[in-house]
Amino acid sequence: MTDSWERGKGRRTQPPWSAPNTQAQPGLRLYNSLTRSKELFVPQDGNKVTWYCCGPTVYDASHMGHARSYISFDILRRVLRDYFKYDVFYCMNITDIDDKIIKRARQRHLFQQYRERNPRPSDLLQDVSAALTPFLQRISEANDPDKRQMLERIHGSVSAALLPLQDAVSSNARAEELERLSQELMEAAVDLLSDWLDEKHGAQITDNSIFSQLPKHWESEYHRDMEALNVLPPDVLTRVSEYVPEIVAFVQRIVDNGYGYVSNGSVYFSTAKFHASEKHYYAKLVPEAVGDQKALQEGEGDLSISADRLSEKQSPNDFALWKASKPGEPSWESPWGKGRPGWHIECSAMAGSILGESMDIHGGGFDLRFPHHDNELAQSEAYFDNDHWVRYFLHTGHLTIAGCKMSKSLKNFITIKDALQKNTARQLRLAFLMHAWKDTLDYSSNTMESAVQYEKFMNEFFLNVKDLLRAPTDVTGQFVKWEVPELELNSCFYSKKAAVHEALCDNIDTRTVMEEMRSLVSQCNSYIASRKAAKQPPNRLLLRSVSSYLTAMLKVFGAIEGEEVIGFPIGGSDNSMNLESTVMPYLQVLSQFREGVRQIARQHKVTEVLQLSDLLRDDVLPELGVRLEDHEGLPTVVKLVDRETLLKEKEEKRKAEEEKQRKKEEAARKKQQQEAAKLEKMKVSPSQMFQLETDKYSQFDESGFPTHDTEGKELSKGQSKKLRKLYEAQEKLHKEYLQMAQNGTTG
C-alpha cells in the first residue's frame, strides 16, 4: 500500500470537478404594445437603454391621470437603473405649442381684458345673454353624457347668478349690491364668456408672448408636482417651442421622401402612400382603429377640424405635420409659409434629435396609442426610412376615481396637489406599486387605505428591528449560534428574494413584489415573537440583513429617499440617520430614568408620579416625534416616528376611546330603556293585558282571558294554548312586580 502511494507521487493530479447543476436565470421581459405580449428585453447598445417618454401638454393643473403615468414610469426607470443596473438615458418632452394651449391662452387673455374693463351691470347682462345662445347650442349638440352634464351644470350656475342681477338692475339697487352681484355673475359665467369672447375677438390677437405665458406657468407647476411626488427629472427635457427649426427640417425630409404633401400652406402625412410601401406598416399599435374619425380628429386638435381644414386632406386618415396658422394663432416661418407644428410631429422630431433613428423604449399613457403614437411611428419611420424606430412600446394603464372615469363633469377631477393634501407622496407611490403598471388603477379611499396600512406595517417592523439593534452588546456578542428558527427564517429570506427577482423579471410585477415583501415581514414578526416568548433574543444580524434588503428594495422603487440604512426616513429628511444617531442615546437615558421612577412610584403607590410618567409618554414626547412603548417585564421600546404620524395615531386613539365610550353609554341607555319597558310591562295585570287588545278579541272570561275574536268566533284550542302561555308568563312578571313594590325596589 505504501509502495503504491510512493510510486504515484509524481503522477498525482486533481480529480475531475463536480460542477453544480445550474438553472437558467430568468431574463427581464416587458409587455410590448407592438406585439401585445411580454418580450425578452434586449437593449440595442450593450447596457445602455435609450428611453423617450411623452410629457404633458401644459395648459392646466397636473392631475392624478398624469400621476398614473409619471409615477409608474419613474418606478420602471428606477428598477431598470438601480435593480437591473442598466445605464438608462431618459428623455421627455414638454408640449408647449398645441391647440388646447392656444385656445386657453386666448380665452384667459380676453376674459382678463373684459374683467379689467369692468362692464356696467346692464352691459354684463346683455353680454351674458348673448353668450348663452351659442352655449345652449353646444349643450344640445353634446353627445358625451358627462360633457353634457358639465355644460348643464354651468348653465344652472349662470342662471342662478343671472336672475338676482336682473332684479337688482330693475329695482335700481345700490351700487355696492350691483357690484357684488356683477362679480358673482362674472365668476359663474367665466367659461361661456371666455368662449364667446374668443369667438368674437380671438382672431385679433397677434402677440405671440400671450401663447408662451400660459405654458410657462403650468410647466413650472408640473415640475413642482413631480418633485413633490419624488419623480426623477429626465436626463433631457425638450420643449416644442425650442425645436421648431428641427421640426421644419423633419417635415421637409418626410415630404422629400414622398410621404408628405403640401395643401393650402399646411403639410399632411399620406397614410396611404406610407402603408403602400413594402417596408412600412401604418398603425402598428392599434391597426383596428384605422379610419376612426373621432379619434383622428381629437388628435388633430380643436382648432384644426373645421370643414376647410378637413377638405385640405387627400384622405380623412391623413394627419397634419405642419399647420398653416390662422389669425389669432402663433406662427413660425417655414418653406410653406407661416405656421406651427402638428401635435404628432413634435415628439418625432424631438425624440429623433436626441435619440437618433431608433430607441429602446418609448412610453406613454394607454389612451395615446392611437392616433398619437401610431402617427409618431409612421412619421419617424418615414423620416429614417426604417421599420424599427421603437423597439419596446410601454403604455401605462388608465386611472379611475372610485370606479368612474375622472371627469370635471362628475366632480371627481383630482389634481396632484389635491391628492397630496390627503396622502403623502410615499403613500401614493405605494398604492401604485401595489398595482400592475399596465392595468387600470382605481384611485379610491380603499386603495389609499391599503397603501397607508402597508406603510404602517412595514414601518413598525423597521422600528422594531432598530430597537433590537440598539440593545447593548460587545463585538463578539452579536454573533450567536443559529438554531432551527434562524435557519428557517434565513431559508424563507432567500426564497422571498428569489421570488422578488422572478417577479421583477416578469414585466416588473411590483404587485407581486410587494406581497412577497409583506410575507417576509410577517415571517420575521412571527420569529421575533417566538424568540421573545422563549425568553431568547432574536438574531440581530439576520434581522438586520432582512430589513436592509427591504429598505434597499423600497429605495429602488423610490419609496425611500436619502441614505437610510433601515426603514423610512424620519420626517422625510435626508439627515434622518444623523438625527437618529444623535438623539437616540439621550432618549434611551430618558427612557431608563423614567422606567426607574415608575418602579419606585409603584412600590410606594405614588399615583401622581405614574400619571406624570404616562403624560410624558402619551402627550409630551409624541409632539417631538418620539414613541415610547411599555411592555410588562421588558425594557421600554423607544421609536423615532414622524411627529405627524404620532399625532394622527393619538387622534385616532382619542376617537376610538370616544367611540368606545359612546357605545358604552348607548348600551347603558338601551339597557335602561329595556329595563324601563320591562317594568312597564310588569305593571300590567294578566287580567288586563288582553282586554287592552280590542282589535283582536271581543269576549273574555272572569280572569280577563280572551275567549272570542273580533268577529265573535270562539278561539281554537291551539290559539287558546298559545295565549295561555303568554298569560301565565305575564302572571309571573306581575307577581314579581308586586313583590318589588312591596320591598320598595321598583325605582
From Swiss-Prot:
L-cysteine binds at residues 55, 95, 372. Its cofactor is Zn(2+). Residues 651-683 have a biased composition (Basic and acidic residues). Pfam families: tRNA-synt_1e. GO terms for molecular function: ATP binding; cysteine-tRNA ligase activity; metal ion binding; tRNA binding. A motif ('KMSKS' region) lies at residues 405-409. Keywords: Aminoacyl-tRNA synthetase, ATP-binding, Cytoplasm, Ligase, Metal-binding, Nucleotide-binding, Protein biosynthesis, Zinc. Residues 15-25 have a biased composition (Polar residues). CDD domains: CysRS_core. The keyword ATP-binding applies. Binds 1 zinc ion per subunit. GO terms for cellular component: cytoplasm. One of its GO terms (biological process) is cysteinyl-tRNA aminoacylation. Catalyzes the ATP-dependent ligation of cysteine to tRNA(Cys). NCBIfam families: cysS (TIGR00435). Belongs to the class-I aminoacyl-tRNA synthetase family. This is Cysteine--tRNA ligase, cytoplasmic. It comes from Xenopus tropicalis (Western clawed frog). The lineage of its organism: Eukaryota, Metazoa, Chordata, Craniata, Vertebrata.
